[in-house]
Amino acid sequence: MKDLTKKSILKLKQSSTLVINEKCKNLINKGKKVYQFGFGQSPFPVPEKIVSTLKNNAHRKEYLPIQGLAQLRESISKNLKKKIGINYPKENIVITPGSKEAMLLLHVAFNGEIILSAPSWVSYEPQAIIGRNKVHWIQTSRENNWFPTAQQLEKKIKSIKKKNLILIINSPNNPSGTICKNLKELAKVAKKYNLIVLSDEIYTDLTFCNKYESISQHYPERTCISGGLSKWCGAGGWRVGFFAVPNELSELLENVKTLASESYSTV
């Protein structure tokens, strides 16, 4: 039989980072020495406190609330408040099986279009395609630290007819490894045009400086934050992420929760 798959899905391929990781494992199993630079897997062990806590709760088997454990959401809320000074109450936080799932649900729920910078993480565009959201690219350069300038962002916004737009910011960035130094300027443009910002902050605790800056500090009212254990904790295979949403975007939060309730049981 033919035509079993939607045309939009036929355009997609398996995530290149995961495919390359499997190829590397196969080569290693064959005795080959592989230097792998394409996968964000920490070589360090998961902190012992987290390991022991997981062991102590291994007997827990009940279904959980759609948004995840209240105690965990409260801890994330307090941590965000401590690090960036912005209040995302636990009621506005959803625990997901990895931050990747959180972003996918946002793409599926969102009725609009996406602004991405090039280069960017390999899964942003495929997720937008799954959500049937058109992607608009901004080409970046080394001179601007591989992030769009405020002028580039404003020019791109003016060229788009759709009113509902999400700007995705990933700082520290995958794949460049750089930190965005013009968040305040980008936030000013985003606010001017009423953009939604998705701040992918999965790498925020992996920097050579103690300063942690989030675009939400400059535009809290319409900035969503995604994060998780995968990078700083080295627990990519555990699949624990979160999605924090400001009060102004409660409609999106409710619909992400609806999608979550029909797809997985959370932590």
Name each model feature, range by range.
Residues 140-210:
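Active-site phosphate-binding strand-loop segment of PLP-dependent enzymes
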Residues 3-97:
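N-terminal small-domain helix-loop-helix segment of the aminotransferase-like
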Residues 109-128:
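Conserved PLP-anchoring active-site segment centered on the Schiff-base-forming lysine
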Residues 116, 137, 197-199, 225:
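Hydrophobic residues in well-ordered beta-strands that form the structural core
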